[in-house]
A protein has these predicted regions:
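Surface-exposed, charge/polar-rich loops and edge strands
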Residues: 1-308
Length: 308
């Protein structure tokens, strides 16, 4: 489910903008094939499921599908079809990720619904595929529902701990605000919040003129610093006005905070072991928590599948 706070085994990691789905459904309804890029993450820090398949020994059991060079510094790509034995092993390993006891122990999440697959990219594409299927399902017989190609979506399954997957922080810059009032309101919003380092969430601010400092929020209710900050900023902007920009790179933040009515916040990069717990306990990541990798590392649209 792409609904916020859902307890399904496959979940969105960020809020789904429902207004984005109908225009996409309009395109998908009449499309005979899909060429999506939907990245779904599994939490496999020991690298036991996908990585062993990339060895030369494992590839000898597979049949080649294609091999080609790519444009725009994309390098080369080769695709292989798993043998029946390999595919069955992967299915068993993925099923084991959904074991309730393993889940509860791994995440200290006794009583929480099991999360197996977390959306990494293409959340709205998968949400559209799901919405189209729900629309089509009542028009099919139970037998047709079992085998109809629109029941499934083509996804790229990626280990969260894949070395090529790099999380980069997204910082905040606000314009058209009074920095002194904003900081005073921030401290007032969280009991015990104070200037300087301490126990809890530490958030770095940048004032006009380049002055930097740290605010500590003790006993935070959110899993991540960005959650603590974004909850406050959303409320502040709603009540006081102003504009927010989401920025990559600390140096860019510092150069933008040059006007007297601006302020910047530098956030730490989310670590990989924080992603699943945050979705499990907070329901979703705060908006613009992180970006994944550089543009030239992103996946090319290579595979298509029939959906009619």
């Amino acid at each position: 489910s792409y609904e916020k706070g859902s307890g399904t085994p496959i979940r969105a990691t960020e809020g789904t903008v429902l207004s984005r789905i109908p225009p996409r459904m309009k395109v998908r309804r009449n499309a005979p094939i899909e060429l999506p890029h939907i990245m779904v993450l599994i939490d496999d820090p020991q690298k036991e499921i996908i990585e062993p398949l990339a060895t030369d020994k494992a590839k000898k059991e597979m049949s080649g599908v294609y091999m080609t060079s790519l444009m725009e510094r994309g390098g080369r790509i080769a695709a292989h079809l798993l043998s029946k034995k390999q595919a069955e092993k992967v299915e068993d390993q993925l099923a084991a990720l959904g074991d309730p006891q393993r889940f509860a122990e791994t995440y200290h999440a006794e009583g929480k619904p099991v999360l197996v697959y977390a959306m990494g990219d293409g959340n709205h594409s998968l949400a559209t595929a799901k919405a189209c299927w729900e629309e089509l399902k009542p028009t099919l017989s139970p037998e047709e529902q079992l085998t109809h190609p629109a029941r499934y979506a083509l996804v790229e399954l990626v280990n969260l701990y894949d070395d090529s997957l790099e999380f980069e922080a997204i910082h905040r810059v606000l314009f058209g605000v009074d920095p002194k009032k904003l900081m005073a309101d921030f401290l007032a919003a969280y009991p015990g919040a104070h200037y300087g380092e301490g126990e809890g969430h530490q958030i770095t601010y940048v004032l006009p003129g380049g002055e930097k400092g740290v605010v500590t929020v003790p006993n935070p209710t959110a899993q991540l610093e960005v959650g603590t900050l974004q909850t406050f900023l959303d409320k502040y902007l709603e009540e006081n006005g102003g504009k927010i920009d989401y920025i990559h790179g600390e140096d860019v933040v510092e150069s933008l905070v040059s006007q007297p009515d601006s302020i910047g916040f530098l956030l730490p990069s989310m670590t990989k072991d924080q992603l699943f717990p945050t979705v499990i306990f907070d329901g979703a990541l705060p908006r613009k928590t992180f970006s994944m990798g550089e543009a030239h590392d992103k996946r090319f649209y290579m595979e298509a599948r029939k959906i009619k």
